[in-house]
């Protein structure tokens, strides 16, 4: 059965330290192409997870929705979908970072490290360090979004790094179709995490991208999710 998002409110949540501006650029074009209505709530770094859940609840008041996001946003959306099977049309998961407890997942380690440096050294020095070790496009993205979320940014990073995502056993109970986009060369969001999500869920597909592709055009990430969803038809 084809998953039809035409006219469907689609709530997409940002990754840790990222924001709704990036979600807009990554997903608005691909979603518009299939007639979906994008809702991209801004992160609330002082209450990151609760803010995401509140946005999902509010959007679902008027009927079933599609949900998803990037990294931690994808994990929160998947957890919400598991808890609300009757209100979830589909799950669009871009760059999932881990399943279950974060443990030593690279994204969790990176968020903890960044939070510790922000607390110790401040925003300017930590941003300079980040820029030196990141691709230029990502450095520019995070410089903008980190500044907007300061001074609560370390709180958001620590909350995300401690988040227990749906486990593979839990994803096996996902009623909604799951479309995953994973990068083949992202050390922070390993391809294996996306493969694990897709292997666990009953109805799921994955498409891959490269960091260079999404750096050149953020919409490549959203397009990969929508292509994966179309494969489920």
Predicted segment positions?
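Conserved HGGG/HGGXW glycine-rich cap/lid loop of the alpha/beta-hydrolase fold
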Residues: 1-46
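Conserved acidic catalytic loop of the alpha/beta-hydrolase fold
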Residues: 47-65
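Gly/Ala-rich beta-loop-alpha elbow adjacent to hydrolase catalytic centers
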Residues: 69-77
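Hydrophobic, aromatic-rich cap/lid helix
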Residues: 140-168
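Short beta-strand/loop motif that positions the catalytic acidic residue
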Residues: 174, 180-182
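Conserved alpha/beta-hydrolase "acid-adjacent" motif
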Residues: 187-193
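Catalytic active-site module of serine/aspartate enzymes centered on a nucleophile-bearing elbow/loop
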Residues: 203-233
């Amino acid at each position: 059965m084809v998953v039809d998002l035409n006219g469907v409110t689609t709530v997409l949540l940002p990754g840790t330290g990222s924001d709704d501006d990036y979600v807009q650029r990554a997903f608005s074009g691909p979603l518009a192409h299939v007639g979906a209505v994008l809702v991209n709530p801004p992160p609330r770094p002082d209450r990151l997870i609760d803010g995401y859940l509140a946005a999902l609840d509010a959007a679902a008041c008027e009927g079933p929705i599609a949900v998803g996001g990037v990294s931690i946003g994808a994990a929160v959306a998947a957890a919400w979908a598991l808890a609300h099977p009757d209100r979830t049309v589909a799950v669009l998961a871009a760059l999932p970072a881990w399943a279950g407890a974060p443990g030593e997942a690279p994204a969790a380690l990176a968020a903890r490290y960044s939070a510790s440096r922000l607390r110790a050294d401040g925003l300017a020095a930590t941003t300079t360090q980040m820029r030196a070790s990141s691709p230029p496009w990502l450095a520019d993205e995070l410089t903008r979004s980190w500044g907007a979320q300061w001074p609560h940014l370390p709180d958001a990073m620590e909350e995300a790094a401690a988040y227990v995502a749906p486990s593979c056993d839990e994803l096996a109970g996902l009623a909604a179709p799951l479309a995953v986009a994973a990068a083949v060369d992202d050390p922070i969001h390993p391809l294996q995490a996306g493969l694990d999500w897709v292997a666990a869920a009953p109805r799921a597909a994955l498409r891959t991208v490269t960091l260079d592709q999404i750096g050149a055009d953020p919409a490549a990430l959203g397009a990969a999710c929508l292509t994966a969803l179309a494969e489920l038809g």
